[in-house]
């Protein structure tokens, strides 16, 4: 079946696209909100994501249209505006700018972008950047190693868009392997792909969209990171540890024993952010061992605990997402679930029993729309599987 982005491209340009780039979305069952503090994470790429039908343009112009957003974007590949423009294409301007700082870009492209799921919670921003970068590299005959691709995509969000994300999203979308759990240390970028044990019960990945799309640019995402940094900086000061600049401080720099000794000196909000970090770090480590042993029930329980910590210690999540989380906790056949992504609107993810998928979708949908009837037609549910990361 022909992709919608291909159909639209052919209608606009009266030719077939040169190629179709793809980057998967991701879920991160464990490791929420700690990648920017150099924590450890668990992740999986899924078989839904961003497609872009494209064709090279020798004149160096980038011309893009999204099926998810209005207005076409256009700019020169070697003359990206210094300041973001405030629209959906800022992520791609940032990607071109970051790539152009290391490589000579001469060839542009025309492209039509299509996301296969609603926006919010599955790292669509990282996916579209990586999808675009893979196409831009191909037409300019540039080869990026996986970690270089990850860091270029991250820099586009950090330095151009202005979102202080860590590298969780990009790493999951690049490094993942089907039927494996990515176990990544975001401090030194070491990682392991843990195969799904033959003894593990089968599972599917369910995605429940709240009906509320989110943008990190207008959320408390960056504030939460500042609170984590502030907690780390204060703890280092109380303990008499050597410390550098505030910008370069992370909770990973502070041993748990120091937190235990001085946590009562912290403002309550900073203490709770740190509590989430240390408990989530431990869950990510324990989760990797559960996955290795094939203990899906144990792993799922950790995912539920992660969701609870995100609500009460990290304090993210709107009423709608909290309701979805509550419903998931009380639904037979769901091994574990939590907010997906930052948790500011968007969606929830769950690891579910394949034999109970339809019953789960019915129960979650009925209970959620009973609580929020105004979201009927905007709420949606999907079932996915693990997938390989992007391949250049």
Residue ranges and their predicted role:
Residues 1-21, 27-40, 74-79, 85-200, ...:
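Gly/Ser-rich oxyanion-binding loop with an adjacent helix/lid
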Residues 38-45, 224-225:
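Short Gly/aromatic-enriched secondary-structure transition segments
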Residues 127-129, 347-352:
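FabD-like malonyl-/acyl-CoA
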Residues 43-45, 53-56, 103:
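Short, charge-rich binding segments
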Residues 33-35, 44-46, 281:
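A short catalytic or substrate-binding loop motif that flags glycine-/basic-rich loops and adjacent residues
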């Amino acid at each position: 079946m022909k992709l919608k982005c291909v159909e639209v491209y052919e209608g606009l340009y009266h030719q077939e696209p040169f190629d179709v780039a793809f980057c998967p979305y991701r879920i991160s069952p464990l490791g929420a909100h700690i990648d920017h503090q150099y924590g450890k994470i668990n992740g999986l790429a899924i078989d839904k994501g961003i497609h872009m039908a494209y064709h090279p343009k020798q004149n160096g112009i980038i011309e893009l249209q999204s099926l998810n957003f209005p207005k076409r974007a256009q700019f020169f590949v070697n003359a990206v505006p210094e300041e973001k423009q405030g629209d959906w294409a800022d992520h791609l301007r940032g990607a071109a700018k970051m790539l152009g700082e290391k490589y000579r870009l001469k060839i542009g492209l025309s492209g039509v972008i299509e996301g296969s799921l609603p926006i919010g919670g599955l790292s669509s921003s990282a996916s579209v950047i990586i999808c675009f970068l893979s196409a831009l590299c191909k037409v300019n005959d540039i080869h990026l190693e996986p970690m270089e691709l990850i860091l270029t995509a991250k820099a586009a969000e950090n330095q151009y868009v202005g979102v202080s994300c860590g590298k969780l999203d990009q790493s999951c979308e690049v490094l993942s392997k089907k039927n494996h759990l990515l176990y990544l240390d975001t401090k030194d970028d070491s990682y392991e792909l843990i195969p799904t044990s033959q003894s593990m019960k089968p599972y599917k990945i369910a995605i429940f969209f709240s009906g509320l799309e989110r943008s990190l640019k207008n959320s408390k995402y960056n504030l939460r990171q500042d609170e984590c940094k502030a907690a780390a900086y204060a703890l280092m000061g109380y303990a008499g540890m050597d410390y550098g600049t505030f910008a370069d401080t992370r909770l990973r720099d502070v041993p748990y024993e120091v937190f235990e000794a001085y946590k009562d000196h912290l403002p309550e909000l900073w203490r709770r952010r740190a509590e989430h970090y240390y408990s989530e770090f431990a869950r990510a480590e324990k989760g990797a061992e559960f996955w290795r042993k094939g203990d899906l029930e144990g792993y799922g329980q950790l995912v539920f605990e992660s969701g609870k910590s995100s609500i009460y210690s990290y304090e993210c999540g709107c009423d709608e997402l909290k309701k979805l989380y509550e419903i998931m906790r009380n639904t037979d056949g769901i091994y574990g679930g939590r907010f997906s992504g930052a948790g500011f609107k968007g969606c929830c993810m769950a690891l579910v029993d394949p034999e109970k998928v339809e019953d789960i979708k019915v129960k979650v949908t009925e209970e959620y729309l009973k609580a929020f009837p105004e979201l009927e037609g905007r709420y949606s549910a999907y079932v996915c599987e693990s997938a390989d990361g992007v391949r250049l």
